[in-house]
């Protein structure tokens, strides 16, 4: 009887508990929007909590990079997707963000029976069951994990792009519209990776 209970407990702990999805870079003026999805069992969800996984915005870049390999190792599956600045300008940020999420979900080996999406907006193209959790990256471990995966992936891209777009301090601002970034846009002009739909005329003159 005891062995049966222990076996049942292990089955519960190893069962997929959460499939969380989140995006980063939605408000930036340069570069793509990234999304990530992370699949966790009940057991590994608890372990990642113990490691300190939480909303990526509340972690230092160093801590996010330290947590990333742990998340990838302990996740049952994960996927990363992105939508380019051009797609954002053509489709609008909401549709482009949804597209990046769908691309991330398509990287999974199996279609999940249910996903948990960060924020209040439905992922409209998704045909399966979904839940929306406002501030989900602070409440749901799989979403917090996804936010870290997406954030590190996007930050790594920004670091690589710094070499080509050195006049915009992309490494420092990560593509967001800081005063310094706008000053450099006025000085150097806009690039093919700037989101033109996010820039006002006053930002360019």
Curated annotation (Swiss-Prot):
Endonuclease that specifically degrades the RNA of RNA-DNA hybrids. One of its GO terms (molecular function) is RNA-DNA hybrid ribonuclease activity. One of its GO terms (biological process) is mismatch repair. It is found in: Cytoplasm. It comes from the Bacteria. InterPro entries: RNase_HII, RNase_HII/HIII, RNase_HII/HIII_dom, RNaseH-like_sf, RNaseH_sf. Belongs to the RNase HII family. PANTHER family: RIBONUCLEASE H2 SUBUNIT A (PTHR10954), RIBONUCLEASE HII (PTHR10954:SF18). Residues 16-205 form the RNase H type-2 domain. Its main location: cytoplasm. Manganese or magnesium. Binds 1 divalent metal ion per monomer in the absence of substrate. May bind a second metal ion after substrate binding. Its EC number is 3.1.26.4. A divalent metal cation binds at residues 22-23, 118. GO terms for cellular component: cytoplasm; ribonuclease H2 complex. Keywords: Cytoplasm, Endonuclease, Hydrolase, Manganese, Metal-binding, Nuclease. This is Ribonuclease HII. It holds the Pfam family RNase_HII. It catalyses: Endonucleolytic cleavage to 5'-phosphomonoester. It comes from Prochlorococcus marinus (strain MIT 9312). The lineage of its organism: Bacteria, Bacillati, Cyanobacteriota, Cyanophyceae, Synechococcales. The keyword Translocase does not apply. Its cofactor is Mn(2+); Mg(2+).
